[in-house]
Structures are given as structure tokens and as C-alpha cells.
Amino acid sequence: MNSGILQVFQGELICPLCMNYFIDPVTIDCGHSFCRPCFYLNWQDIPFLVQCSECTKSTEQINLKTNIHLKKMASLARKVSLWLFLSSEEQMCGTHRETKKIFCEVDRSLLCLLCSSSQEHRYHRHRPIEWAAEEHREKLLQKMQSLWEKACENHRNLNVETTRTRCWKDYVNLRLEAIRAEYQKMPAFHHEEEKHNLEMLKKKGKEIFHRLHLSKAKMAHRMEILRGMYEELNEMCHKPDVELLQAFGDILHRSESVLLHMPQPLNPELSAGPITGLRDRLNQFRVHITLHHEEANSDIFLYEILRSMCIGCDHQDVPYFTATPRSFLAWGVQTFTSGKYYWEVHVGDSWNWAFGVCNMYRKEKNQNEKIDGKEGLFLLGCIKNDIQCSLFTTSPLMLQYIPKPTSRVGLFLDCEAKTVSFVDVNQSSLIYTIPNCSFSPPLRPIFCCIHF
């Protein structure tokens, strides 16, 4: 092949980011191709739309598939480069004046066919150089994929911890305000209990804040280690075949050790102490709720709320579900326009439920209409994925860092004060009070259970 034509051919197989032959090439929407590792490293912090460095068009960084044809062509180009290298006078076997085509995996040396059959190498494991190089490169790519998945997981966890740390003090203050407000409704002799519970809450809040900072620092440090190891593997992958084989060493073992002991996000719980006489006070407003059952599809508002929730103060701390759910609703037959009302729901050890009250027009809303979680829906919910079980309240959406109730949960509706309070009946403790509710009476009780 004419050398000029060969150069043009080889030039089409060069990644524009690393300027080496493609390694596991991916082609994005605009038609330009990059090494997958180069693409990952350059656009790691851009989760959805990325701008092509060649044409500036935007594309989605999801479901990238290897361009098999381009990968085969790049492999062929490396073989041509290897053949040119091995054909040079300097690489000829000094003893037999033959081309070195064999790689000895024991002492990592290049041999001609006669040397590989000698007494010294006869019992060693041998491979053709181009086969051995591609095999080693594939091992590196497999390890890089595992490493990158862990790096992405760590990156998500770091975002979780960063968000939690940023909003933790505000969350603690909200809990303190809610408990103070509850004690103001109790007799004066509860003053010492109130003081004790608030002090314990402050102390626990500071401890968790410190632990969040430590967890965040560990994850940031682990992120640097993972990225550094990934870059080292990527650099090794791009080496010429002979250099790759001779420099391979213990890099796979070292990369495996990096994957051990990955830091996990904290699961902070800021439990509040029991409030003496809380249930007795609320039982003065006890009502019996009669429910009307119906089944709803996955487009209903509650599922939209669960899907929209992500970790921390930015509503992003609740597990994301990809499965299609079946949602079972139970509406209260009664409606409320004024006054104070209290009722309880038995939740036991279950999860993926929510209950509360909603503005009456909610029930008549078009199911296909996009739902704003801040609009007329006042719920306590519990959802679970494989990792954690999380409590949240709505209006606005907010994660509640408290232990999950294990028996009965009470709801206290105060139409005049425009508040909805949830209590852990077993613990006689306040879960949370939703303040300044945008009530549009009549209000209707609601219970929902979602099956994934």
C-alpha cells in the first residue's frame, strides 16, 4: 500500500482527544467518534447533554455502544504498526536473524520462532505478539469498565453527601422549630422535657454534620484515586503493542485493590424524643375515616412525585424507580373545610406507601396533566429500593431523616392553622409538621400503596 494512502487510512482511526488509535470507540449522535475512556474522562461531570469537541453539537451521554467496525479497523491499524516495528533491523533476532513474532509470558520477552523452542523457553507459555497484545488490552478494558462503574457510583454518592451536608443545618433547624411549636400546645410542666429533647436533637445534629463532612472527604479522596487508576489503565491501553506487553506488570492487581472498601453514604437518622401526652391531646380530635378504594395507573400524581424526587434538599435523596408500578388509592369519604381532626393509619413493616390529605380538586385532576408536587398535596410517604428505606413529606418535597415508623402513624389536620402534622404513635414523637399549607377546601384524606 502506498505510504501516503496508508497514512490517510490510519489518520481516520485516530481519536481526536488522545491522538492515538481508537480504543473501544463510540460514535455519538453527530457522527464523530472517540475512545470510550477518553469520552468518559472528558465529560464525566456532564450527566445528560454534552457538546461534541469536533462540531459543538449537543448529544446525550447515555447508552453508548461500541462501534464494532471502527474497533476492528483500529485493531488492524495497530497490527500494521506492529508489523512495521518488528520488521525493522533493530528488532531482528540477534542469534537467528529472524523476525520476533512470539511473546513469552513468563519473562515478558519477544522471541523468534526458533528461540521459543530453545531449552530456555521450551516450557514457557507463548503467544503470537498481536494476539497477546489484544488479549491484554481487552483485560484492561474490562477492568476499566468495572472501575468506571465504581467511579460513577462514588460520584453519585459524593453528590448525595455534598447535598446533605449543605442543607443539614437547615433541616435540623426545621425539626427544632416543629418540636418547639408542638410543645407550645402542651401544658407548661413539659418545659424540662422540651429542653432535654431539644438539646439532644442539637447534639445529635452536630454529630451527624461532622460525620457527613468526614464521609464527603473520604468519597472525594476515593474519587481522585479511582480516576487516577482509570487514567493509568487508559494510558497503558494506548501504548504500542510491544510496550504494553513488556510494561503490563501488576497493573490489574493494583486496580483490583482500588475497588476494595468503597465508602458508602451515611444513612443519618435524627430521631426526636417522646412527647409526653402527645397522643392524649390529639385523641381529643379523633375521627374515623371511611375509605373508598380504587386502582390507578402509573401516570397518577403520586407516582410522578416519587419519580421526581432525587437526593437531599434538592429532592434527590429518594430512590429512583425504573419499573412500572401499580398504584392503589384509597380516598376518604369524608371531606373537611374547617376545624381540627386526627386519625391514624397502621403501616407496620410495609413500605412504598403514602398518606395524608389533598385539596378536593386533586381527585378530579386529569391524570395526564403534569403534576407539581408543591400543589395541594400534603403527604407523608415511605419508599424503598435495594439500598435504603426513606421517609419524605410533600409541599414542599423533603426527605425526613428519622427512623421509619413500625406500627401506627397519626395525622393531625388543623384547617385554621393551615398545618398537617404526622406523629409516630408508638414513639409518641413528632415526625414533621407541614407549615403554611395552601389549603383549598374541601380537603380529602388519601392513602396510596405502590407495588413495583
From Swiss-Prot:
A GO MF term: zinc ion binding
CDD domains listed in its UniProt record: Bbox2_TRIM43-like (cd19783), RING-HC_TRIM43-like_C-IV (cd16603)
Keywords for the protein's UniProt record, in alphabetical order: Metal-binding, Zinc, Zinc-finger
Domain B30.2/SPRY, residue spans: 269-452
Gene Ontology biological process terms in this record: innate immune response; regulation of gene expression
Ranges annotated as RING-type zinc finger: 15-56
Residues holding Zn(2+): C93, H96, C115, H121
Cell division keyword on record: no
SUPFAM superfamilies hit by this protein: B-box zinc-binding domain, Concanavalin A-like lectins/glucanases, RING/U-box
Protein name, as recorded: Tripartite motif-containing protein 49C
Protein species of origin: Homo sapiens (Human)
Protein's gene: TRIM49C
